[in-house]
Amino acid sequence: MSEGIDALSLKEEDVVKFLAAGVHLGSTNVGSSCQGYVFKRKSDGIHIINLRKTWEKLILAARIIASIENPADVCVISSRPYGTRAVLKFAQSTGAIPIAGRFTPGTFTNQIQKRFREPRLLISTDPQHDNQALTEASYVNIPVIALCNTDSPLRFVDCAIPCNNRGIQSIGTMWWILAREVLHLRGIISRKTPWNVMPDLFFYRDPEDIEKEEQAAAIASAKPDEPYQPDFSGNVDQSAAGADWGDQPVVTGADWTAEPSVSKDWAAEPAGWEADTTAVSGDWATPKTEDWA
């Protein structure tokens, strides 16, 4: 379908991205409606998806999305946790409405619901996990584009993009390339220059790993206590520098060979002890008059 137009043809750099992310790796089972997308079967039972069929369906989906005038009429959904980040990034890049996480029943059919929506197009990450959304879309005639594996049910799916919709890198790569092609068809970005958004931003990240990286970055950015550095660049006092430190006053010392002069005779008896004893009012040597017996 896209072989006649060089801009829409599959390029080598896109094939390298597909192979590095594992987009071509299917499951061990194959549905009857997905047999045309399988290239071959490996010895371990995993089916290989034909990447040329994947690219043709991806370009068809991008043309369908670009044909809608209002980007807000496109709804992208992912109940699978690995696709929530990719869905949010796709919606941020293209202006679509994201539904990441659990789908509330009645979003497309119950008009009295607070989050009631009437999109013109629905894009799903996995039709098996997003079965409720696809069922409601069939009630109100909303066309559905879905990333499908070899064993995915294609009921209520109008445009199936065969790929590995279970891997983190595969889901992120598919949503990234789909967003890039939509922006190319809308004329927002040029095909001559590469898109400045990296595919890694569409990959799922564990919140615990993000918190650990933030803590490590905070510790690395904190400045350690620097040791004391003496300032040797200060000006020296010229008056002190010009002084002769050798001209010190001579202090005459004492004659240590002379006999020490005794000013007091410590062997003499001290005088006045009797006066001190008479000053005491009581006589401690006097026997007691009280008979305790």
UniProtKB/Swiss-Prot annotation:
PROSITE patterns: RIBOSOMAL_S2_1 (PS00962), RIBOSOMAL_S2_2 (PS00963). InterPro entries: Ribosomal_uS2, Ribosomal_uS2_C, Ribosomal_uS2_CS, Ribosomal_uS2_euk, Ribosomal_uS2_euk/arc, Ribosomal_uS2_flav_dom_sf. GO terms for cellular component: cytosolic small ribosomal subunit. Keywords: Cytoplasm, Ribonucleoprotein, Ribosomal protein. Pfam families: 40S_SA_C, Ribosomal_S2. It is found in: Cytoplasm. One of its GO terms (molecular function) is structural constituent of ribosome. Residues 219-293 are annotated as: Disordered. GO terms for biological process: ribosomal small subunit assembly; translation. NCBIfam families: uS2_euk_arch (TIGR01012). Component of the small ribosomal subunit. Mature ribosomes consist of a small (40S) and a large (60S) subunit. The 40S subunit contains about 33 different proteins and 1 molecule of RNA (18S). The 60S subunit contains about 49 different proteins and 3 molecules of RNA (28S, 5.8S and 5S). Interacts with ribosomal protein S21. Required for the assembly and/or stability of the 40S ribosomal subunit. Required for the processing of the 20S rRNA-precursor to mature 18S rRNA in a late step of the maturation of 40S ribosomal subunits. Belongs to the universal ribosomal protein uS2 family. This is Small ribosomal subunit protein uS2.
